[in-house]
Amino acid sequence: MADDKVAILTDDEEEQKRKYVLADPFNGISREPEPPSNETPSSTETSAIPEEEIDWIEKHCVKINNDLLISKVFYFFFYSAYGSLYPLLPVYYKQLGMSPSQSGLLVGIRYFIEFCSAPFWGVVADRFKKGKIVLLFSLLCWVLFNLGIGFVKPATLRCVPKIRPTTHPTNASHQLTILPTNSSFTSFLTISPKMREKRNLLETRLNVSDTVTLPTAPNMNSEPTLQPQTGEITNRMMDLTLNSSTATPVSPGSVTKETTTVIVTTTKSLPSDQVMLVYDQQEVEAIFLVILVVVIIGEFFSASSVTIVDTVTLQYLGKHRDRYGLQRMWGSLGWGLAMLSVGIGIDYTHIEVLIDGKGCKPPEYRNYQIVFIVFGVLMTMALIVATQFRFRYNHFKNDDSKGKEVEIPQVERNNSTESSEETPTTTSHSQAFNFWDLIKLLCSVQYGSVLFVAWFMGFGYGFVFTFLYWHLEDLNGTTTLFGVCSVLSHVSELTAYFFSHKLIELIGHIRVLYIGLACNTARYIYISYLENAWTVLPMEVLQGVTHAAIWAACISYLSAAVPPELRTSAQGILQGLHLGLGRGCGAMIGGVLVNYFGAAATFRGIGMACLVILLLFALIQWLAVPDEEEDKTMLAERIPVPSSPVPIATIDLVQQQTEDVMPRIEPRLPPKKTKHQEEQEDVNKPAWGVSSSPWVTFVYALYQIKEMMQLTRDNRASEIQPLQGTNENRENSPAGRAQPVPCETHSDPSRNQPSPDAAASQTQTSPAHPSVDPCTEESEEQQAQLAAGGH
């Protein structure tokens, strides 16, 4: 029955079948052959659809790769959830009452945990062939542990008077002046307080023992006044026990020892400019420890999700690994849209804060629970989409073995000293030796300086990711501004990712690093002098150069310097330095610096450090690195580049299975041939065409001027003598040395018409000088034609 159906296929159906075959996904994965029963209904249904509808479906739907579509949708939802929450976490921690150092630790420790846990879970997934289970469990941990942070209750706010700069903050000593109504005296009291705070009542019991002196001025109306250093004045009850030990009279009379108890109650609140809001530090410490535990546990179990999805996506792509950026682009699109939408939504939501005390203006706190709700919904959608991923371990194993079989001969061809009949033991020893060679290569001055720049750029990016919005909020920036900044930075990164290889081929890897460091210097110093938060937008465009182009240049530079079998290790080291160690140190060390010096001063300091590193790096590259031709001709490879939030995704995990499909071709220089020589060999180019070589054009112009001057003096055939002279004349003539191939002069009959006498002299001198010039060894028939043309 199936044979009859195949036999009656029309030409149109054959064409449609061919299109379906061509539209098969180009992922390089060998699909298992499906039974013919599944293919037969599809052909029957196709024949039943009208032609116009078939054309529309073919143009819009048939060529869609379902596997890559799942990857695109997952990246969109995952990074939408990530972008809606994680950039705002430092600002959220600030609202909870944490210091910059605490916030930096909570953000920076994630990178170190991801660096350690992502490879661990990747090995577990490959070893037990449970990639989908590990992926789904990881995404579930993303939802649960991050939503737990949103239910943390903020610390209590207290309204306290500002600390005077002249008082001593550690030893609580208060100077109390009391003037009673019956008599006038001034007592200088040294008070050692023991304070007990509650929410609405602060009781201070002061045990005072000091000397009381009677002044001479009588009848002074006075009120009890209190100048405390710390504590709350409103609703305060103070019990003063005055134990006067001695009395020094100034006027006649004496004061005997007495014990007096004075109760002072004040209800007057200070002005708003003399009070400030502080958090209860004990509650802040408790909140910090709770969130730290949640972050450590949650990141350990959830860090492997993006690594696994990247690996599956690269398996779907197969030999078209350069199209990874097209899949990852949807994640950046979702990040920008989610960040902008959430930022606008938060600006219109506020929460009321209960303040312990009076006299302070309530702060405007935003409701960040919306962020956690949006994160939970989007990450749940990513979890649902992740259930559609297909893991083929048998295929991966077969391709891995094939890749090893092809890779070993490639290594043997590269190493001329190794024989082609090496044993597996020798091969493994060679691979270990090559790994140590890689370590030595990366520790050299040339590549070690590049790795240091990669680490420092990661340091700067981690600091900006954590404290840029923190600083903008200090300048009264809104979350809408944060969303606009996110959109600009992601558009800049995408543009830089897709055009970075052309920029590298144009100016080179090292110059791209120069530009990135210079842009970082300008960006950080500009941010440090901001007065209006919205003026930061022009500098957000530099995000693509300072992050994307730098990352692409570093990974391309190292990948082109190491052999293919060690490229995965080199990229892993670079990712660890840039994405893991660099960003983690930037967030944690930057938090300590902001805590001590402030955000503006820290931005300014890191900007100056970028300038110093730029100068040192340029000096090292100028003095210590040889300027070789290989470095100039090194081409940028289109290596898939992960964007900012990818947690150490080993992009080259499937390196072995792609080397046999798409081997790396070393760039070879073309044979050296000047442009002038190519023009001389081109018989179709007219003789009056300008040469591309400037010095040849200049000499040729001088020669033509000299020739025309000779024509004006003597109208006889003097123009042929310089073009076809003897060896002595040609060696002494600079024009003859400049134009070693004057064959093209024959292509212009109007300029090179020989006279009869010259033609006759040529026929006489050419046998005598057979080696004068290849152009003079012409046949007698050609000489006769030239002579005839002269008449």
From Swiss-Prot:
Residue intervals passing through the bilayer: 73-93, 105-125, 132-152, 286-306, 335-355, 369-389, 450-470, 479-499, 507-527, 544-564, 579-599, 605-625
Places the protein is found: Membrane
Membrane topology: Multi-pass membrane protein
Biased composition (Polar residues): 750-768
Tissue: Widely expressed. Expression levels in peripheral blood mononuclear cells are highly variable between individuals, including no expression at all.
Major localisation: membrane
PTM annotation (Phosphothreonine): residues: T10
Keywords tagged on the record: Acetylation, Membrane, Phosphoprotein, Transmembrane, Transmembrane helix
Gene Ontology biological process terms from the UniProt entry: antigen processing and presentation of exogenous peptide antigen via MHC class I
Residue ranges of the region described as Disordered: 22-47, 407-427, 662-687, 723-791
Residue numbers of N-acetylalanine PTMs: A2
Low complexity composition-biased segments: 37-47, 416-427, 782-791
Cellular compartments per GO CC: membrane; plasma membrane
InterPro entries membership: MFS_assoc_dom, MFS_MFSD6, MFS_trans_sf
The family this protein is said to belong to: Belongs to the major facilitator superfamily. MFSD6 family.
Quaternary data: May interact with HLA-B62.
UniProt protein name: Major facilitator superfamily domain-containing protein 6
